[in-house]
Amino acid sequence: MREYKLVVLGSGGVGKSALTVQFVQGIFVEKYDPTIEDSYRKQVEVDGQQCMLEILDTAGTEQFTAMRDLYMKNGQGFALVYSITAQSTFNDLQDLREQILRVKDTDDVPIILVGNKCDLEDERVVGKEQGQNLARQWNSCAFLESSAKSKINVNEIFYDLVRQINRKTPVPGKARKKSTCQLL
């Protein structure tokens, strides 16, 4: 079974843990409890393939920055999360993406831009088109709006990253085996 190392990044309070726990355990975490680092494992089926996801739920961008390079070095796919109710959390993501590309030393990194808390439409300050435009600027990276509370697009975030990783690095052993003939 193929393993995938996914990293959830973004400012404090955007709902990184809520999305991760909703995906892994099917529970909405109401209370805000700042994360230092939590790791979760979940087996899922994506496009008929069994996958083991290892999801690293990280501290907000303003904390524990020394650990961030290590997450980025080891991660294969990244969910960059902002809250649609806080412009500053959206603005923080540009530097985060640049840091990922610098650490990975490539522009071709599986990334999904996630506008979380889309259930709070009355409190929206970051328009959906702002997210779409930023995703286009980022080499047309994937973009979704989500809500951990309302279970909107939660699974899709992680499944999309798995699909991006599969496109970038196809499953080994899928190629047709060459047959050889030996004369003795």
UniProtKB/Swiss-Prot annotation:
Subcellular location, principal: membrane
GO biological process: Rap protein signal transduction
A single cellular component GO annotation: cytosol
Residue window of motif Effector region: 32-40
EC number in record: 3.6.5.2
Binding site residues for GTP: 10-17, 57-61, 116-119
GO molecular function terms listed in the Swiss-Prot or TrEMBL record: G protein activity; GTP binding
Record localization: Cell membrane; Cytoplasm, Cytosol; Cell junction
Residues where lipid is bound covalently (S-geranylgeranyl cysteine): C181
Family matches, as Gene3D superfamilies: P-loop containing nucleotide triphosphate hydrolases
Top-level taxon of the source organism: Eukaryota
Main EC class the enzyme belongs to: hydrolase
Residues with PTM Cysteine methyl ester: C181
Function: Probable GTP-binding protein that possesses GTPase activity. May play a role in endothelial cell polarity and endothelial barrier function.
Family statement: Belongs to the small GTPase superfamily. Ras family.
Listed name of the protein: Ras-related protein Rap-1b
Gene: rap1b
